[in-house]
Amino acid sequence: MIGVCQLHLRIPESHSLKEKRHILRKVIDRVRHRFNVSVSEVGDNDLWQRSQIGICTVGNDRRFVNSSLDKIIDFIEKMYLADVIEKEIEIITF
């Protein structure tokens, strides 16, 4: 199973692209180190108060993969650095 999640974030404390990248780096690094998943900014690169990040994880159980993505989303929301305004989750079976 491959779990893919795309999050649309609003970053209210950002007033420039430099501040946005600084905040995103914190979010991405903390998620990557805590959950051992792949994370990257995948959209809205030139908007200073919005971003899209992609998260990918793999596992052999659908419930585990889905639960992992839910925990990551909850973790990001509880950091209070960015607001999750939209989320898309897809579980791919191969």
Question: PLM features: residue spans?
Answer:
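Hydrophobic alpha-helical membrane-association signature
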Residues: I23-V27, S68
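C-terminal binding/interaction regions
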Residues: K20
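Amphipathic alpha-helical assembly/interaction segments
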Residues: R30-G43, N66
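Short glycine-/aliphatic-rich beta-strand segments at the starts of folded cytosolic domains
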Residues: G3-E13
